[in-house]
Amino acid sequence: MIGESRPLFWGYEVTSCGLIVKPDGTFVTQSVNNKGYSQVALRNLDGQWFGGYLVHRLVAHVFVKNPRPDIFREVDHIDRNPANNVFSNLRWLTKSLNLLNTNAKGCHYIPKWKKWRAQLRRKTLGYFKTYEEAHECYLKQREELFNSEYRQLCENREHEKNIRRPSLIFFSETAARCPIPCFS
């Protein structure tokens, strides 16, 4: 199913599901850039090639109403999957709003494998089909790590309570004199 097709420019058409149709009716080959976004190269009426058109922007330009073209200049993938270019998954946003929908810390999409990777402190926790599964794994591992480190700190605190550390005294005295909060 290719969805509804609408005219783009130079005789090309774009479908609501993210396919680009050539003037002769065949589909344009799409490639994936290093950030996971589909892109195409199109030939103008003079036969010159122009590359790097991002498919999600072409789909949004034709199918998604932009309520404020003066400020909404970026296209957001609602499900955070850059390979999903269906028009119902796209919306126009400002750059700052688009950044709010970026991947949560610890979850990254791997376009080559079409999977989400959960990662904590440079350690891969696993690969998952959906963002939600990867994020859930990340949160669980983060909580376990935090709890174990917290317990360890509490256990060591009783043992180290009476030990004087000159370096800590130096930093606390320096911090007290510093007008700018330079030490936490």
Task: Please provide the spans of the model-predicted regions.
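Conserved recognition-core residues within compact binding domains
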Residues: 1-74, 80-171, 175, 180-183
